[in-house]
Every structure is written in structure tokens, then in C-alpha cells.
Regions:
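N-terminal secretory targeting modules
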Residues: 1-86, 91-97, 134, 261-267
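Hydrophobic residues at beta-strand termini and immediately following loops
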Residues: 86, 113, 220-222
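Short, flexible loop segments at the rims of nucleotide/cofactor-binding pockets, characterized by
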Residues: 58-63, 115-119, 197
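Alpha-helical cap/lid subdomain in secreted, periplasmic
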Residues: 5, 16, 102-109, 118, ...
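Soluble periplasmic/extracytoplasmic beta-strand elements of cell-envelope proteins
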Residues: 82-84, 111-112, 177
Length: 267
């Protein structure tokens, strides 16, 4: 009797276990497969935009600025003496103040090759395509203030003078008359205050005047005609103390015209 009770109890236990395993999906004798957890799919990030080339790395001297105009420029007309103005923003500013002159003045073949912010080493690099290759009779060079401001890095005054001399001598070697213009007065730089440029300007101008006389070049002294008691440009001639207004260019124009005439008259 006791044996029958034990068998019945064991049977009930087996049935209960079978029910439990069936309920949780376990089938005896069948290996269970593991199911990995679902990993959410993350969209690939959008490609980064292509970096914008730094022009100071790809074209430091800005040779492309006047390339197309240089190529398209016809040779000087017969009997007309071409003059190229090489410089920085002050030369570029001539565009609205007489260089190039009004189209009606066909007797003046004046070509403006000023680029704002440039220093003398940049100008020296582009001197051949922007000056020599244009076959001018005269080049007017106005440069150096941005060297003193450190626009392209620290420079000594001797380095500035060397670059000015190199441009002048390159021109002379190609039969181009040279007009060297004094650096304009500057008491301070609004974009780099505290550099005290006034005495440095005077030092380069003193060298330039002597160098021009020694080599037979023309020296145009804008500085003496425009400087104020501080050694800078007065507010009547400049809003920022560096770039001349129309009133400033009105003083400069007859001076540079006289310099060009003197250069053309020289043997």
C-alpha cells in the first residue's frame, strides 16, 4: 500500500515539472538556443564638410588676384607711357581717387596693382606678373606700413628695406623707371594698437630717401606733406589714422604726378 502511494506522489511531481517546463518553453532533451539581445542600429554620421582652403597657405602672395587682368591687359598704346602702381590698401584706395584715371583720360595708362593688407615680401613675389610682365615705363612703389604692423609676422626694418630695394632693382633691370613713395604717417594701428609705428616709419623713409638718391630713383615724400604733430595722419585726412580720405589723396595726387613726370624725364 505504501509503495503505491509513493508511485502516485512521484507521478504527480513529474506531471507538475512537465507543466512548468512547458510553460516556460523548455522541452526536455532539446538543446536551447540563445537569442542575442537586439542591438539598436545607429545611422552613420554625415561626412564632414570639406575644409575651406586657407588662402594664406594656398596663395600667400595672392597671385591669383590680378592674374586674369594681367593676362587680358593689352600692350601699352603707341606713344603712351604705362605706369603701374604697386602697393597695399593705400594703393588700392587710389581706385576711387584717380588710379586708374577716368576712362576719358586716354593719355594716362595707369594700372593699379594694390592689394589690401599686403606686406613687402608678398609684393616682391608678385612683382614679376603684376609689374614687370605688364611692360610699364614707370612703377610707383608704396609699401612697408603693413610690415611695421606685422601683418604677415614679425619683420625687421632692414628686411623691409631689402624687399623695397629688391623691387626697385628688379624694375631697373628691366628698363622700368622707379618712383619710391615714402611710407605714410601712422601714429598707431587700429587693428594692432600699441606698436608705436611713427619712429619706425621715419627710419624707413630716411633710408629710402638716401637709397633712391644713390640709385637714381625718384623719391616722393607723402610723409612730410601729411604728418601731424604726433607723427600720424590728422583726422582731416584719415578716419582711422592709416588710410587716407579723399582729402588725403588730393594732396598725394600732384606729388605722385610730379614724381612720375620726373622719372619719365630722366635719362
Amino acid at each position: 500500500m505504501n509503495g503505491l502511494r509513493r508511485k502516485a506522489a512521484m507521478l504527480r511531481t513529474s506531471v507538475g515539472l512537465a507543466a512548468i517546463t512547458a510553460a516556460i518553453g523548455i522541452i526536455p532533451g532539446v538543446a536551447q538556443q540563445s537569442h542575442p539581445a537586439t542591438v539598436p542600429v545607429t545611422a552613420a554620421p554625415a561626412p564632414a564638410p570639406a575644409p575651406v582652403p586657407d588662402p594664406m597657405r594656398t596663395d600667400w602672395a595672392n597671385l591669383k588676384r590680378f592674374h586674369d587682368e594681367d593676362v587680358a591687359l593689352a600692350a601699352p598704346a603707341a606713344g603712351v607711357k604705362r605706369v603701374v602702381f604697386m602697393g597695399d590698401s593705400i594703393t588700392q584706395g587710389w581706385v576711387h581717387n584717380g588710379v586708374p584715371p577716368e576712362p576719358a583720360d586716354a593719355a594716362k595708362d595707369w594700372v593699379n596693382r594694390g592689394i589690401s593688407g599686403q606686406t613687402t615680401p608678398q609684393m616682391l613675389i608678385r612683382f614679376r606678373p603684376d609689374v614687370i610682365d605688364l611692360k610699364p615705363s614707370v612703377v610707383v612703389i608704396l609699401a612697408g606700413i603693413n610690415d611695421i604692423a606685422g601683418n604677415t609676422g614679425p619683420m625687421t626694418l632692414e628686411e623691409t628695406e631689402g624687399n623695397l630695394a629688391s623691387m626697385a632693382e628688379l624694375a631697373a633691370a628691366h628698363g622700368i623707371k622707379v618712383v619710391m613713395c615714402s611710407i605714410m604717417p601712422a601714429f598707431d594701428f587700429p587693428w594692432r594698437p600699441g606698436l608705436e609705428p611713427a619712429p619706425k616709419v621715419i627710419a624707413v623713409n630716411t633710408w629710402m630717401k638716401a637709397y633712391a638718391a644713390e640709385h637714381g630713383f625718384v623719391y616722393v615724400d607723402y610723409h612730410s606733406a601729411m604728418v601731424d604733430s604726433r607723427g600720424g595722419l590728422p583726422k582731416t585726412l584719415s578716419n582711422d589714422g592709416v588710410h587716407p580720405l579723399k582729402a588725403g589723396y588730393a594732396i598725394m595726387l600732384p606729388l605722385v604726378e610730379a614724381g612720375i613726370a620726373k622719372a619719365l624725364a630722366a635719362n
